[in-house]
């Protein structure tokens, strides 16, 4: 395939080939979706913000011995990544009750969980990304027992690192979604992105349930000032690291 041929387009990113078959170019879009793409819109500047935030977080995780697909960013909205085979599993780590966890249980939003809750969803839009047990994952052969154990270990470690990091930015990490892939050597690698699109982030300077939201919930719940929330996350990360 020729250089920069479109390989795949998702809701928030486009993947392109490069001259190196083992390296892909990810373009971060300003498009926003929610509720399995039932709600669509545009968040101005989101692509550049998410790309920059993800690059900083991937670098942080790499220094803490979490392997990622990140290589570098040739532009503010583009990221070069190692080619991996994505596992069709969305891994969710929750520290505070919010979103679907509240809808599916009697927990109220804001309840601090006794321990980090690690959940798995089948990445399948047709099925609306159903919650899966470990045994269902194994029966569907979405991952091996060894891979699931490693995924959980990585997820818990990533959570510890990010809680500490965001706390230093005066941001509370409520929950987040991550994805993993396998490289050509079958090594498990963190892929996709970590940004306000995939994390719930609350401003520690705010107490109002709506004002504190700094993530895509501002878009989901029509809270307004979506761009401002994303930009504030980026500014605090840059200020902390600068």
From Swiss-Prot:
Protein origin, superkingdom: Bacteria
An example Gene Ontology molecular-function term: phosphoribosylaminoimidazolesuccinocarboxamide synthase activity
Pfam families: SAICAR_synt (PF01259)
Keywords, comma-separated and alphabetical: ATP-binding, Ligase, Nucleotide-binding, Purine biosynthesis
SUPFAM superfamilies, per database record: SAICAR synthase-like
E.C. code: 6.3.2.6
Top class in the EC scheme: ligase
Disulfide bonds: none
UniProt pathway: Purine metabolism; IMP biosynthesis via de novo pathway; 5-amino-1-(5-phospho-D-ribosyl)imidazole-4-carboxamide from 5-amino-1-(5-phospho-D-ribosyl)imidazole-4-carboxylate: step 1/2
Catalytic activity: 5-amino-1-(5-phospho-D-ribosyl)imidazole-4-carboxylate + L-aspartate + ATP = (2S)-2-[5-amino-1-(5-phospho-beta-D-ribosyl)imidazole-4-carboxamido]succinate + ADP + phosphate + 2 H(+)
Entry's Gene Ontology BP terms: 'de novo' IMP biosynthetic process; cobalamin biosynthetic process
Annotated PROSITE patterns: SAICAR_SYNTHETASE_1 (PS01057), SAICAR_SYNTHETASE_2 (PS01058)
InterPro entries: SAICAR_synt/ADE2_N, SAICAR_synt_PurC, SAICAR_synth, SAICAR_synthetase, SAICAR_synthetase_CS
Family of the protein in this entry: Belongs to the SAICAR synthetase family.
Protein name: Phosphoribosylaminoimidazole-succinocarboxamide synthase
Native organism: Trichodesmium erythraeum (strain IMS101)
Lineage: Bacteria, Bacillati, Cyanobacteriota, Cyanophyceae, Oscillatoriophycideae
